[in-house]
Regions:
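Hydrophobic alpha-helical positions that pack around
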Residues: 3-5, 53-161, 167-172, 182-183
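Short amphipathic alpha-helices and their capping/turn segments at secondary-structure boundaries
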Residues: 1-12
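Metallocofactor- and cofactor-centric catalytic cores in central/energy metabolism, strongly enriched
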Residues: 28-33, 58
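Histidine-anchored nucleotide/phosphate-binding helix
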Residues: 33-49
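Gly-rich Lys/Arg/Thr-decorated short loops/hinges at beta-loop-alpha junctions or inter-strand turns
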Residues: 14-28, 147
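Short helix/loop capping segments that flank catalytic or ligand/cofactor-binding pockets
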Residues: 23-26, 91, 151, 163-165, ...
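Ferredoxin-type iron-sulfur electron-transfer modules and their immediate structural context
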Residues: 139, 161, 171-226
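Active-site loop ensemble at the mouth of alpha/beta enzyme cores that anchors a bound cofactor
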Residues: 10, 87-117, 191-213, 217
Length: 226
């Protein structure tokens, strides 16, 4: 859902969903401690835009480095909410309930209960846009799995996934499979020539599997799966 549309809503609570519930992805937890002050400023800008009286950053208990970096920077009106280290903590509706006590009805938007939700990278981009008039031209993502050098890297939007894979030293297995995002909710990548977009969640490299299993996995991860 576009951030500029979300920020037009007038709500009571602005929530940063920083749970990063997908295994193997490390982007949000790393950005939170590396750019803690910018994240807090981004929350303040978003609160101003939406009229929110409270800002909440919801993150998992195990992200100790991020918690330690953010805690001393929190002004009045912004707080951390510590989520359990379980899946699916990070699901938007569940996170709203855990962090605010408000329940979003089926098919309703968070704004219906007075909440706007954004992710860590979006909030950081809000701060850059306000302070430096930066457009979103880069994406930070995790490259993990069967690669020579697992890493989190910031790359230009439009860079091919093949080039991203090369930054991690390439695959370490024969006939690998590739997932855009995490292993639970990510989608199969059919071509490494596909570009990085504003919504690319990560690049996971998995060992090859027999064709029958691969077909089953493709069906599970496809948009048409029931």
């Amino acid at each position: 859902f576009p951030a500029h549309v979300k920020l037009q809503a007038q709500v009571e609570i602005f929530l940063v969903n920083a749970a990063e519930c997908e295994p193997m992805l490390k982007v949000d937890q790393q950005l939170m401690w590396q750019q803690a002050a910018r994240l807090v400023r981004g929350v303040q800008y978003a609160m101003t835009a939406t009229g929110a009286r409270e800002g909440v950053i919801a993150l998992k208990e195990k992200y100790r480095r991020a918690i330690d970096a953010l805690t001393p920077l929190l002004p009045a009106g912004i707080r951390l909410h510590i989520l359990p280290d379980v899946y699916p903590a990070g699901d938007e509706v569940l996170t709203i309930w855990l962090a605010t006590g408000r329940r979003v009805a089926p098919a309703a938007l968070p704004a219906s209960v007075g909440v706007v939700v954004n992710n860590v990278q979006t909030v950081l981009n809000i701060a850059r846009a306000v302070e430096q008039q930066f457009a979103v031209t880069r994406r930070t993502l995790t490259v993990n799995g069967a690669v020579a050098r697992p890493l989190t890297v910031t790359v230009p939007i439009g860079m091919s996934l093949r080039e991203v894979l090369a930054l991690a030293g390439g695959a370490t297995v024969d006939d690998p499979g590739f997932i855009n995002g995490g292993p639970m909710m990510g989608g199969l990548i059919t071509s490494l020539d596909s570009p990085v977009t504003k919504t690319t969640g990560g690049l996971l490299v998995l060992p090859g599997v027999p064709s029958v299993q691969a077909d089953a996995l493709a069906a599970i991860l496809s948009e048409d799966a029931v």
